[in-house]
């Protein structure tokens, strides 16, 4: 469901319509049905998409002055302040998600869909690949595994492999996420549905 639909639910009256609503929905989803069974939960966030100032509550307005109003009236410094505030709120959101999963066997993937170019009185993304500056397509990705998940030796070895790749700054791509999610969970596909070459968790025993 869209966050606007979630925000319209009677249980959410008076709450800000932002990404934190998804954390409560995640908790509800895990509690429904077979609470001890397997769950695949996908949270589609607004993150740090423009309008940046609308992505976080006032309590997260750490850097000021902010960009308020239309972006072509905002200075580069104001745009960056609002963007940085939104990133801080994304961090808060991610920690809140992880806090719900620390006592469970869980693995979490996070990926931004694109970056932003911020200039004086303008912000840009979606520039054609051959022309795009690095900040638009080199985006953060994260893989987190709970302590309970890491009790499995194979999971621990896969996570160590991920950490090694991160330390070596091995470049990764969005197109590899499906194969990685399935591979890290231990699924294989003999008919080629899962490309092991794209599996970040792949390691040799």
Language-model features: where?
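A short acidic (Asp/Glu
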Residues: 52-56, 99, 119-123
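Short glycine/proline- and charge-enriched loop/turn segments
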Residues: 2-10, 122-128, 157-163
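A long, amphipathic alpha-helix that forms part
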Residues: 24-31, 66-110, 137, 142-144, ...
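Histidine-centered active-site microenvironments of extracellular/periplasmic hydrolases
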Residues: 106, 111-154, 194, 203
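Active-site-proximal alpha/beta segments of enzymes that process anionic O-linked groups
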Residues: 1-68, 173-204
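Catalytic glutamate of the conserved HExxH
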Residues: 45, 89-93, 110, 114, ...
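A short beta-strand-to-alpha-helix junction
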Residues: 77-90, 129-139, 150-181, 189-196
